[in-house]
Amino acid sequence: MPEKPSLANVLSSSGRIKILTILSNVGELHLSEIARKTDQSYSATDRHLQELSEASIVEEHDYGRVRMFRLNLENPRAKILRQLILEWDNSTTPKMIDGQA
């Protein structure tokens, strides 16, 4: 059985975070569209999506020659990441934690 990737590994790349953010907000997108929206090269986007797919965070669907990607919401980790991203994006003011902003 493959080893589960650590949270640090999944979130260690700003490119992967951008991809997760786009997919959390939009849903399913074509690889080229993800690359364009995240301002990354096609090859870098493909590599990040492959890593996220191997971690079962993202799932790929092929429609002929078109490769579409979306979050794998069957995976509890992907659900948690999506919830975190949506909460983070919707938060307009920093919350006070132990007297610190």
What kind of region is each of these model predictions?
Residues M1-K18:
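Short alpha-helical segments that sit at the start of domains
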Residues M1-K4, L73-A101:
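Amphipathic alpha-helical dimerization/coiled-coil segments
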Residues S14, V26-H30:
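Short capping segments at the starts of secondary-structure elements
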Residues E33-R36:
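A short acidic, leucine-rich amphipathic alpha-helix
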Residues S43:
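Key DNA-contact positions within bacterial/archaeal DNA-binding proteins
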Residues D46-Q50:
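Short, hydrophobic-biased segments on the C-terminal half of alpha helices
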Residues S53-Y63:
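A short, conserved structural fragment
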Residues D62-M68, E74:
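Short, Lys/Arg-rich nucleic-acid/phosphate-binding segment
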